[in-house]
Swiss-Prot record:
Protein name: UDP-N-acetylmuramoyl-L-alanyl-D-glutamate--2,6-diaminopimelate ligase
Keywords: ATP-binding, Cell cycle, Cell division, Cell shape, Cell wall biogenesis/degradation, Cytoplasm, Ligase, Magnesium, Nucleotide-binding, Peptidoglycan synthesis
The enzyme's E.C. designation: 6.3.2.13
Species for this entry: Synechococcus sp. (strain WH7803)
Function: Catalyzes the addition of meso-diaminopimelic acid to the nucleotide precursor UDP-N-acetylmuramoyl-L-alanyl-D-glutamate (UMAG) in the biosynthesis of bacterial cell-wall peptidoglycan.
PANTHER family reported for this sequence: MUR LIGASE FAMILY MEMBER (PTHR23135), UDP-N-ACETYLMURAMOYL-L-ALANYL-D-GLUTAMATE--2,6-DIAMINOPIMELATE LIGASE MURE HOMOLOG, CHLOROPLASTIC (PTHR23135:SF4)
GO molecular function: ATP binding; magnesium ion binding; UDP-N-acetylmuramoylalanyl-D-glutamate-2,6-diaminopimelate ligase activity
Length: 499
């Protein structure tokens, strides 16, 4: 892929300096280490250093031109004659728009559905991918666990990738035959303009509960970051293009703002998308799904009321893209779930009833933990045991809240470490335990492996152990180091030693 710098700048409405107008751009990157001959380097501000300060190194590495923001230019002024373009901040916006233009606007040549919210993004995007594929529409998935499209799969490092990589991946997905793409869109990505250059033909709001208040100054700011996805320039197209959970108070506020642009979905009230005649068992749920385009019977193997909302929103989003309801409902039974989301741990060669039930889930917020525990309760014949912790260097306010929820909904609580990061693990546990009632059945074990083993060792047949917080993650962050750690492996090992 090559383009002239003149064409790229003109495509996004930036002025074209005479000195570099005829330069040919062969690659676009925001990483100075990846600059080669003919690259356009865009210097982005970072947490510790401003990437714009690396413009001399980028030019020395052969960059055709460099683009930096006004703040970086003030700190590291380029000399007259340098191939450095200074643009208004935030430079991240221009990075996304230029990357999109360089790759020929890939998001506008597919049906890109963005999913945002505190909980439910991963399951909803996986559902959209699965249902699209089952309906004969090749699909891509961009999210917390994986970025994949036909013929390609790559473990994700962030919920939403940086703009230069994201646009390149969208272009590659398009080349691979993708027609529908489901993307998890985090509040950080929206606030930091990582999805600049994307045009979404559909958007889903799952819910908003306390999380990331170490980053956002308030819940209102957190909401407004999420709401950016549903406004120009991101959400495009005529007619209803959004699916919003109005059982959530923030969702009701968003739906009121969007008006006829949104389909409202609810499990509690009349809405555009609803369910009725529900029958829940350990094998999933059966019921009727009602939409503005008709209704039908469905079966889903997913357990838990919160998963019903994920199903409702995935079906609604794809209906808005023109997929037929009968095909979508027929495809639901074959969706088996997402790794680390209410994942059952069963020993090979052993019947499930021969040992305590063990589930691993990613629940790491107050609402997520409540949903997971409530989903478990109908299937517990004995005691419900909850193992959980809270991440370090993150929102401290949710720690006592999660403890109170665990104590209220579980019979026994084992408090342990999650990802302590650079915070004192003992202090994190103290913050959590402060939320436990004095009479709560609790044990505290800072070593997560020992805590999992302890919970499973004391469980009996008929009990259920929920290990919450890390889900699919196969690492633990201790200090600044990532070490291998997988709740599923630890649970399986503990089950092998269970009496």
């Amino acid at each position: 892929m090559t383009q002239t710098l003149h064409a790229l700048l003109k495509a996004v409405g930036l002025p074209v300096p005479a000195g570099v107008a005829n330069a040919t751009v062969t690659a676009l990157t925001c990483d100075s280490r990846c600059v080669g001959q003919g690259s356009l380097f865009i210097g982005l501000p970072g947490e510790r250093v401003d990437g714009g300060s690396f413009w001399p190194a980028a030019l020395a590495s052969g960059a055709a031109a460099v683009l930096i923001g006004e703040q970086a230019a003030a700190a590291h002024p380029p000399a007259p004659g340098d191939s450095v373009l200074v643009v208004p901040d935030p430079v991240a916006f221009w990075a996304g728009e230029l990357a999109s233009a360089f790759w020929q606007r890939p998001s506008m040549r597919m049906e890109l559905i963005g999913v945002t919210g505190t909980n439910g993004k991963t399951t909803t995007t996986h559902l959209i991918e699965h249902l699209s594929q089952a309906c004969g529409r090749p699909a891509a998935l961009f999210g917390t666990l994986v970025n994949r499209w036909p013929g390609h799969s790559l473990t994700a490092t962030h919920t939403t990738a940086a703009a230069d990589r994201l646009q390149a991946q969208l272009a590659e997905a398009l080349e691979g035959g993708t027609q529908v793409a489901a993307m998890e869109v985090s509040s950080h990505a929206l606030d930091q303009q990582r999805v600049a250059g994307c045009r979404f033909s559909g958007a889903v709001f799952t819910n908003l509960t306390q999380d990331h208040l170490d980053y956002h100054p308030s819940m209102e700011a957190y909401f407004e970051a999420k709401a950016l996805l549903f406004a120009s320039p991101y959400l495009v197209g005529e007619g209803p293009r959004a699916v919003v959970n109005v059982d959530d108070p923030w969702g009701r506020q968003l739906a009121d703002r969007l008006g006829e642009r949104a389909w409202r979905c609810s499990l509690a009230h009349e809405a555009d998308l609803t369910m009725a005649d529900l029958r829940m068992t350990s094998n999933g749920v059966d019921g009727a799904l009602r939409t503005p385009l008709g209704e039908g019977r469905f079966h889903s193997p997913l357990v838990g009321r919160f998963n019903l909302m994920n199903v409702l929103q995935a079906v609604g989003a794809l209906l808005q893209q023109g997929l037929p309801l009968p095909l979508l409902l027929n495809a639901l039974p074959s969706f088996r779930g997402v790794p680390g989301r209410m994942e059952r741990i069963v020993l090979t060669g052993s019947a499930a009833e021969d040992h305590p039930a063990v589930l691993v889930d990613y629940a790491h917020t107050p609402d997520g933990l409540r949903n997971a525990l409530e989903a478990c309760r109908p299937f517990v014949r004995g005691q419900l045991i909850c193992v959980f912790g809270c991440g370090g260097d993150r929102d401290r306010g949710k720690r006592p809240q999660m403890a109170a929820i665990a104590a209220a909904l579980a019979d026994q609580v084992v408090v342990t470490s999650d990802n302590p990061r650079t915070e004192d693990p003992g202090q994190i546990l103290d913050d959590v335990v402060a939320g436990l009632p004095a009479d709560a059945e609790r044990q505290v074990e800072v070593d997560r492996a020992k805590a999992i083993a302890l919970a499973i060792a004391q469980a009996r047949c008929g009990d259920l152990v929920l290990i919450a917080g890390k889900g699919h993650e196969d690492y633990q962050i201790l200090g600044t180091e990532k070490v291998h750690f997988d709740d599923r492996e630890q649970a399986e090992q503990a089950l092998r030693h269970w009496r």
